[in-house]
Amino acid sequence: TGIIEFFSFDDGSPGGERYSRIIGTIHDATSGQESGKLTFQVASHDGEDVDGLVITGGDAEDVVDVTIGNIATSTTTIAGDATVTSKLTAKTRKFEVSSATDGDYGGDVVYFGGTTSMTTGAIYYYKSDGTWEPTRADTAATCDGLLGVALGAASDTNGVLLRGMVTIDHDPGAIGDVLYVSASAAGDCSATAPSGSGHIVRIIGYQVSHASNGNIWFNPGSTFVTVA
């Protein structure tokens, strides 16, 4: 076992305090299965040493297990992208209402389609040629498949939101309204269901905040109705 400790003073008497330490220990001393454990501890609020990062040799060759944080109320902040190459398990996924800025979002995003000159905050459908085009509910072909909200001018760079909180580029209705693909304006949604013969009635989400900001929960239904 090896320990590196970091001491300083508090602002009281002053008194000496240990503010952090690094502890290296044996995790498994079994011959042929040797593994170690490295623990990073910090003083947490009352001076008590608690684990902040624990790195442990796994139960198989080349496996390393890592535990970050201490109790459930601890916060881990990643300033940038996080890449998970296997499974991700999360007890809760928090969606926050988007801001007043068109294209602000939180949710599931794809980066494909090779489409440029998209309108940020407009609704698009995925075409049979592999590109995106603004929706319109006057025919099934322009709104019956995969739908998404453009998050910028280029689908492969800025992304297209498939589900989540997002700010669209128009005023669709009032708070709590059910929203439908619009038959009158390409790329829009509306709280008024299309009613013309041959029009498609498809729910795409709900208004969740001030209508003039265009904050919606975008979650297109997989079914639709054609007006007779």
Where are these predicted regions, by residue range?
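Beta-strand-rich receptor-binding modules of extracellular spikes/adhesins
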Residues: 1-87
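Glycine-anchored, exposed beta-strand/edge motif detector
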Residues: 11-18, 29-33, 39, 43, ...
